[in-house]
């Protein structure tokens, strides 16, 4: 019998698994009881939770379905979902969790016609993705090569070795008779034949109709025989793990099915291609062929010089659709730093739908528009940007023109926009919450730029604050959530307010955790004023001095895996998600003029709502 605190851990861990990972198809009360008992056994012994998922073999050879043989946005989104669950379990249970992904390529290698080199490239790239989220110690991708039972075998012998060491000869010999006496087994067999006929259609195209049917029967039977051998191997080596599955199973306490994507269907990234539908703001999981044949303007998005996913836009006219199809789309990182570059002369930014731009910025953190028609006057940018909301009003107007003729510019510390509003805005944290006054987004337009050191290019730095929140151990993340800093601007004009913020909070847009932190060293840009910020600890369970805390935050946010160096060019328009991004700038020598605007948050209690402005004016 566990004490109340440990029993609460069991409930918390169960909720995380049920809420974030498990599909719960045909769930039974017995299945829930069994799951909780497995978790209870770990907690009773202060043991690490162990999860096992046989999956992620390789990309299919069918290029009607996928973009290539390497992992892409699909795999990244699934792995990031796993990392999120791992961090949340760590936050409520200090021993944490180890999540094993057992790559089952060798189990089925004789039937899927994928080169061994492609499998190893695929697995290596998966590990790099996990490493980019700083989770390699807890999300492990393993294979037969990691187990003594397969010592002495070469990798092309693992397929046969699995059958010889862990197979059930009687199951294989009596397969036809067993299939006729077990409806579930027969349905699995028929389902495999149907799936593999479609998945391997290019490989099977050289066969006659009769030979193709024979080969499909051989493949379906062979995969079921190998699957049974794999089950025996996994039971022998991972018998103490909670067994997860990418296939649909009733939740009765044996195998727990997963939805890999937010879409509640049993789809896998190695048989699919991702498309971000900017009209809805959601990823769509489907075959490459179906995406390309869907309505709208479909653009390939590149990352690390290879196809990564698709992007769907809409156009008002056929002519505009043709122009938008010429856009080049690239990502700096796996899921942040989108660049849309026009390769067509005289394409205005108004050709892009405002709602779709907002969805892109919300999802990818920053969106750079390059090569579009330039704004000749601030009012042009103001008129365009205010189509989708009211701008934050400053004493000097809605557009902040940050022009400098200085030859040397110091680095701009990391921060987020309007973290310390000027006193004339009347923002008081006793009256307003973070989401009441913090702009959801802002834009930076590079009107002119000359850099004497770097060939006309200077870098603005952005940090993926959402990735930062899952890159740290869940236990530390919660300590940072319970740590608050007071930021006090060191200036007399325009008298910005001192504000208090936790280091980790929830994004009002996406509801994901984000890091909220500003570097105290250096000068921050507040309208046309530069000032330094003093930070002091208001509350913290782990820190009593600012210096070691700032050192740790510099380690987290200074990680190159989280940072994007935006090589700003003249005419670039940078749209920024102010909640999921921290911004800074590198030092440079030269001249630069930037125009900046922020949109008011869509809160009924915004300081710029008429009723609040009237109240503030009366008080003034």
Q: Residue spans of the language-model regions?
A:
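A substrate-binding/cap region within the structured catalytic cores of diverse enzymes
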Residues: 105-264
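Terminal domain-start leader segments
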Residues: 36, 327-421
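Long C-terminal appendages of very large multidomain proteins
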Residues: 258-300
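N- or domain-start disorder-to-order transition segments that initiate the globular core
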Residues: 1-52, 301-358
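Active-site environment of non-heme Fe oxygenases that use a 2-His-1-carboxylate facial triad
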Residues: 304-348, 405-620
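Hydrophobic beta-strand segments of well-ordered beta-sheets in folded domains
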Residues: 47-52, 93-105, 139, 232, ...
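Short loop/turn segments at strand-loop or loop-helix junctions that form parts
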Residues: 45-64, 100-109, 141-149, 444-447, ...
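Histidine-anchored nucleotide/phosphate-binding helix
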Residues: 74-94, 352-357
């Amino acid at each position: 019998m566990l004490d109340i605190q440990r029993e609460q851990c069991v409930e918390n861990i169960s909720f995380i698994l049920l809420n974030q990972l498990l599909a719960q198809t045909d769930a039974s009360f017995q299945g829930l009881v069994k799951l909780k008992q497995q978790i209870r056994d770990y907690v009773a012994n202060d043991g690490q939770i162990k999860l096992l998922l046989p999956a992620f073999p390789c990309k299919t050879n069918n290029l009607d379905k996928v973009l290539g043989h390497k992992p892409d946005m699909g795999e990244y989104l699934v792995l990031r979902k796993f990392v999120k669950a791992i961090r949340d379990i760590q936050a409520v249970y200090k021993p944490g969790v180890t999540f094993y992904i057992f790559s089952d390529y060798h189990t089925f290698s004789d039937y899927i016609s994928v080169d061994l080199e492609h499998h190893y490239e695929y697995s290596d790239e998966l590990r790099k993705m996990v490493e980019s989220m700083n989770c390699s110690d807890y999300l492990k991708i393993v294979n037969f090569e990691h187990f003594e039972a397969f010592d002495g075998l070469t990798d092309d012998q693992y397929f046969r070795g699995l059958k010889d060491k862990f197979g059930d000869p009687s199951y294989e010999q009596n397969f036809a008779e067993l299939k006729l006496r077990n409806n579930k087994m027969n349905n699995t067999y028929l389902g495999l034949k149907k799936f593999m006929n479609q998945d391997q259609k290019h490989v099977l195209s050289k066969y006659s109709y009769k030979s193709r049917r024979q080969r499909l029967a051989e493949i379906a039977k062979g995969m079921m025989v190998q699957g049974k051998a794999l089950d025996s191997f996994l039971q022998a080596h991972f018998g103490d793990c909670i067994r997860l599955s990418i296939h649909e199973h009733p939740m009765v306490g044996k195998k727990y099915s997963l939805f890999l994507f937010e879409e509640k269907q049993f789809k896998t990234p190695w048989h699919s291609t991702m498309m971000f539908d900017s009209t809805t703001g959601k990823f769509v999981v489907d075959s490459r062929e179906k995406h390309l044949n869907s309505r709208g303007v479909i653009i390939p998005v590149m990352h690390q010089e290879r196809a990564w996913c698709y992007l769907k836009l809409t156009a008002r006219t056929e002519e505009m659709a043709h122009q938008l199809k010429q856009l080049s789309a690239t990502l700096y990182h796996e899921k942040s730093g989108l660049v849309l570059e026009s390769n067509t002369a005289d394409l205005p930014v108004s050709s892009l739908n405002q709602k779709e731009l907002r969805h892109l910025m919300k999802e990818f953190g920053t969106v750079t528009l390059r090569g579009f028609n330039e704004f000749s006057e601030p009012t042009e940018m103001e008129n365009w940007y205010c189509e989708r909301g009211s701008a934050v009003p400053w004493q000097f107007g809605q557009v902040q023109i940050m022009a400098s003729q200085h030859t040397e510019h110091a680095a701009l510390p990391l921060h987020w926009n309007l973290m310390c509003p000027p006193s004339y805005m009347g923002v008081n944290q006793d009256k307003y919450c973070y989401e009441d006054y913090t702009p959801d987004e802002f834009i930076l337009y590079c009107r002119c730029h000359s850099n004497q050191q770097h060939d006309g290019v200077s870098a603005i730095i952005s940090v993926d604050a959402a990735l930062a929140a899952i890159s740290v151990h869940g236990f530390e993340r919660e300590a940072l959530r319970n740590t608050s800093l007071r930021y006090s601007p060191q200036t007399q004009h325009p008298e910005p307010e001192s504000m208090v913020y936790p280091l980790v909070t929830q994004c009002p847009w996406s509801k994901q955790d984000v890091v909220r932190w500003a570097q105290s060293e250096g000068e921050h840009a507040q309208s046309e004023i530069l000032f330094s910020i003093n930070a002091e600890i208001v509350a913290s369970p782990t820190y009593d001095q600012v210096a070691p805390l700032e050192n740790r935050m510099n380690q987290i946010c200074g990680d190159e895996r989280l940072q994007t160096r935006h090589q700003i060019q003249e005419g670039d328009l940078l749209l920024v998600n102010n909640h999921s991004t921290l911004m800074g700038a590198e030092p440079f020598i030269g001249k630069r003029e930037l125009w900046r605007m922020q949109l008011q948050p869509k809160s009924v209690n915004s300081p710029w709502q008429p009723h609040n402005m009237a109240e503030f004016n009366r008080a003034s």
